Amino acid sequence: NGKNILRIEDTDQTRKVEGAVDNVISNLSLLGIEFDEGPVQGGDSGPYYQSERLDIYKKYCDELIKSGAAYYAFDTPEELDEMRKLQQLEGRQTMYDRRARDLSMNEVSENLKSGKPYVIRLKVPLNEEIRFDDLIKGTIKIDTNNIDDQILLKSDGFPTYHLANVVDDHLMKITHIIRGEEWVTSVPKHILIYRALGWEVPH
């Protein structure tokens, strides 16, 4: 009795290919795969292009900021590149060093007023263990100290996959998620976002 929803995940504008969405819809139709909701049919959960849902993602990002579950980061590309090079030189894991986690409200306000570009990052709690059950792999445990403070909202105002999918999966009432192997390590980040927003984590 579930619904089949087609959602177009087009938040990475650098990889946008003209005509690709039409090809996807056409090929799925040729395979006999039909949708209850989507860009063609419409429905209660629209819009179905993530690029048309930016205000929705911004709203929830603001909630995460207010609750202390996310923060502004004003690092330049050059600063981030220097940070990664130093980590590699020292043989450390390459990840954000959380330098912007503890910026004061005044510092954030001044940076915003000056128009300094920013991203919004997930404030991953330290020294915790995230557990989740995978139907294939069983129980998986991840130390939060090894989880990057993931970017949620990019400097261009577009969300990353992590924020957009959590928000959309919740609002579209998705109950079960099938992931590729490469996305399993992202599950703890998604769980943290669900928790911070007070939402139930899907299976």
Q: Where in this protein do the model-derived segments appear?
A:
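Active-site cores that bind ATP or allylic diphosphates and position pyrophosphate for catalysis
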Residues: 66, 71-203
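N-terminal Rossmann-like or analogous alpha/beta NTP/dinucleotide-binding catalytic cores
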Residues: 1-90, 144, 158, 185-203
